[in-house]
């Protein structure tokens, strides 16, 4: 239990310290120290809880009511933040959704759950261990990379506007708070507390995407928050349904009940699946993740690899035992995921902006994970988990490489990366490694897609197999194109007309 508490509390402490410290050297030292500590804690967590089986840790019953009030306070704080920003920037839709969340949160606490026991249990399983490693190692690594990147970013801001305020303390505080919220999502068993962490990630993403405060950044930040608030409202109403009908708020008990009596939980499962689809940026909600590319590169890397979108597919994978026996939500999830994978893979071919290629690739791979979760068989679930692991590692590397290349060559356009192997050989090698990890044998993504194909074949669903085949062909095309741009080497000019 101490390890779990440390994983949740340590990033919060780091966020608070980084929020008040203005000195560059002190900020660097604290961020690196806490990032290293989070990574070490994640590895220690994996060592302790590795292996089959699940572990549950319940907090004392007398903590239930205070924790319930803390939970409500965080819910209201997040919603009020959104209301304030929506009023400031005159966004009525975001204002309406946030106001609705406030009303539902109060109703749920003081009417639906009035007098009910608030049980706070932490649950660790194999998927939770994998997610902790991804969040703790990849996420903290991105935070360290952001130190150098944001120094250059601030220097550029000062060059453009000598009066520009240094907002890096906010940036790093939000980054570390993001990690804490993600640890909450993957480790907590209480669905009300999971919802709270879910909405915290939505707010953190909003603040990071709109960090530059340009008109484009603000528009894309509100697009993100509106789409994810729709999912948040769906999540809330699933909790209300469970409370009204006396069904368990324990996620593990809910999944067991749904697997045994799928008709009983069809509505809340469908609502939760909708929440997962919006968070995972699946069509037609994919545009918020494309818009997130206006944010600084560390934000893009964090959103795509270890946080936010991974929360969406994590929820869907956790619900997979119910999808395996419940036709309606299963068909919805499989259809959305399969079409997203195929269509976004083809959309990526037409892109020359490296970050947009990575964004479409991320959405496509999340679609494949979503489809696997919707199938719900053990083979499909393990294929989804493999995709989550290998995609997180490769995509974080690629985003960081693209950000570094943009700083040095002044462009993120793939067409401008000709002869990058000669100009920046070390960076080009890392970028090529990341690209090959996405589609070349013997790297993990190819193995994961093979596992996906096997699981789809076993379902007998021909449409799924066709979508996988066409999407994979498109994937090969845009990665091979990018790889070719990087690997070109200039030679001596030769007259071929002689």
Annotated model-derived regions:
Residues 2-6, 13-173, 246-260, 287, ...:
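Transmembrane helix-loop-helix hairpins at membrane boundaries of multipass inner-membrane proteins
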Residues 140-194, 204-497:
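Hydrophobic transmembrane alpha-helices and their helix-loop junctions in integral membrane proteins
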């Amino acid at each position: 239990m101490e390890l779990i508490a440390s994983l949740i509390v340590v990033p919060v402490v780091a966020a608070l310290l980084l929020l008040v410290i203005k000195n560059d050297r002190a900020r660097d030292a604290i961020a690196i120290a806490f990032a290293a500590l989070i990574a070490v804690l994640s590895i220690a967590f994996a060592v302790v809880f590795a292996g089959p089986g699940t572990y549950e840790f319940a907090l004392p019953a007398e903590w239930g009511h205070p924790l319930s009030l803390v939970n409500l306070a965080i819910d209201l704080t997040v919603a009020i933040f959104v209301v304030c920003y929506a009023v400031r920037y005159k966004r009525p839709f975001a204002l309406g959704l946030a106001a609705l969340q406030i009303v539902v949160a109060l109703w749920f606490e003081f009417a639906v759950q009035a007098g009910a026991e608030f049980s706070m249990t932490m649950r660790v399983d194999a998927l939770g261990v994998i997610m902790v490693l991804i969040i703790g190692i990849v996420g903290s690594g991105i935070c360290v990379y952001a130190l150098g990147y944001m120094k250059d970013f601030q220097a550029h801001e000062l060059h453009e506007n000598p009066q520009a305020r240094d907002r890096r303390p906010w940036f790093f505080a939000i980054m570390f708070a993001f990690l804490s919220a993600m640890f909450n999502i993957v480790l907590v068993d209480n669905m009300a507390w999971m919802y709270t962490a879910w909405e915290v990630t939505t707010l953190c993403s909003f603040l990071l995407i709109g960090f530059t405060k340009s008109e484009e950044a603000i528009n894309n930040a509100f697009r993100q928050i509106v789409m994810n608030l729709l999912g948040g409202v769906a999540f809330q109403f699933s909790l209300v349904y469970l409370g009204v009908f006396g069904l368990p708020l324990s996620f593990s008990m809910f999944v067991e009940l749904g697997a045994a009596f799928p008709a009983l939980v069809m509505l809340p499962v469908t609502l939760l699946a909708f929440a997962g689809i919006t968070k995972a940026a699946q069509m037609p909600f994919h545009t918020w993740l494309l818009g997130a590319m206006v944010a600084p590169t560390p934000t893009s890397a964090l959103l795509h690899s270890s946080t936010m979108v991974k929360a969406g597919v994590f929820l869907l994978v956790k619900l997979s035992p119910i999808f395996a026996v419940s036709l309606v939500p299963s068909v919805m999830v499989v259809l959305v995921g399969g079409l997203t994978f195929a269509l976004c893979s083809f959309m990526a071919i037409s892109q020359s902006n490296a970050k947009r290629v990575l964004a479409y690739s991320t959405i496509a791979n999340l679609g494949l994970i979503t489809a696997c979760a919707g199938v719900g068989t053990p083979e499909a679930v393990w294929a989804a988990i493999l995709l989550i692991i290998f995609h997180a590692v490769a995509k974080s590397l690629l985003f960081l490489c693209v950000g570094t290349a943009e700083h040095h060559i002044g462009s993120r356009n793939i067409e401008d990366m000709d002869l990058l192997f000669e100009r920046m050989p070390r960076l080009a090698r890392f970028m090529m490694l990341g690209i090959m990890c996405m589609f070349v044998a013997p790297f993990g993504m190819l193995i994961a897609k093979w596992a996906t194909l096997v699981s789809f074949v076993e379902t007998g669903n021909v449409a799924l197999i066709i979508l996988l085949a066409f999407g994979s062909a498109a994937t090969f095309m845009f990665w091979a194109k990018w790889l070719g741009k990087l690997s070109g080497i200039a030679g001596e000019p030769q007259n071929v007309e002689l």
